[in-house]
Amino acid sequence: MKDVVIVDCIRTPMGRSKGGAFRNVRAEDLSAHLMSSILLRNPNLDPNEIEDIYWGCVQQTLEQGFNIARNAALLAGIPKQVGAVTVNRLCGSSMQALHDASRAIQVGDGDIFIIGGVEHMGHVPMSHGVDFHPGMAKSVAKASGMMGLTAEMLGKLHGISRQQQDEFAARSHRRAYAATVEGRFAREIVGLEGHDASGARFFYDYDEVIRPETTVETLSQLRPVFDPVNGTVTAGTSSALSDGASAMLVMSADRAKALGLTPRVRVRSMAVAGCDAAIMGYGPVPATQKALKRAGLTIGDIDLVELNEAFAAQSLPCVKDLGLLDVAEEKVNLNGGAIALGHPLGCSGSRISTTLIHLMEEKDANLGLATMCIGLGQGIATVFERV
């Protein structure tokens, strides 16, 4: 099979969903901005050679409906003969897009793909139009569709304290802010115009969502939001609501070499796995175990890890059971994560992969793991290797 390489990986800034920077920017525009940026950044690439575009999005309705991948591609000026499809594996959608493109390359169904994803959670809320089949109650508790309650359950099962959650969340903001002021995020962000609080046009090239003033002390004052009586999960220890997009240029190694394009990493292995919907946040553990086995690796071989921070109460059990607790400060989410940046559902898979790849280059790391939980009990994971 052909080797799959990532040639470029970028993202938009993350904007607050409630009256934030992109309140007047549509999801298609966020997506098209990155698609066109991929082409501008890689002039050796003839866009007519692109086989297909795989674009993750969860709430495929309103401005995100009717195949947003194709709509955005047309807005971006991608040649009309290039296909585009919207992919949905809930939180793992854009990582699934990467997996789909990778498999297509491996079996010879194309050499050049753009992948990515978007979610404008300010324009299309996560719960918009959701209508679960009543019959699901026979096998899945109703609370399993409420992500915050599944985090509460997972945290309780693993003995995760409120203090631990607050410390993890404060770390996320602290590290994300440091990555901003030290210019590390600038390497992955492609800025675009939005509107500031007064309504004036403003060019955003930084994440609006990070709260640098966040401390364990301020977080400790917040009340539990999902289980007000017995819970420990607060808004501050949950991933923020944000709007954003991410994208990658994925190619066969042979075609990248022929075009004189330098690969950043290769896709070493991929996996998805299911778990109990009541503890959906545990999905990264079985997915990672599968991906490592397929790569012939152990967790000790992995130099850097990006774990999507849906909730602190969800992330910490995964870190613990993956055997990363003692090395988390050196290996896991070194630039913070979704608690600070937000989790625009369809965007996050390629967003965390993009951050990971840039960190691997910065730290001269050989092997990296990107993994995330998925609503209703799934996990997805990708192992990357420097080339």
From Swiss-Prot:
GO terms for cellular component: cytoplasm. Its EC number is 2.3.1.16. Coiled coil: none annotated. The active site is at C91 (acyl-thioester intermediate), H343 (proton acceptor), C373 (proton acceptor). One of its GO terms (biological process) is phenylacetate catabolic process. Pathway: Lipid metabolism; fatty acid beta-oxidation. The keyword Lipid metabolism applies. InterPro entries: FadA, Thiolase, Thiolase-like, Thiolase-like_sf_Thiolase, Thiolase_acyl_enz_int_AS, Thiolase_AS, Thiolase_C, Thiolase_CS. Signal peptide: none annotated. It is an enzyme of class 2 (transferase). One of its GO terms (molecular function) is acetyl-CoA C-acyltransferase activity. HAMAP family: FadA. Belongs to the thiolase-like superfamily. Thiolase family. This is 3-ketoacyl-CoA thiolase. It comes from Aeromonas salmonicida (strain A449).
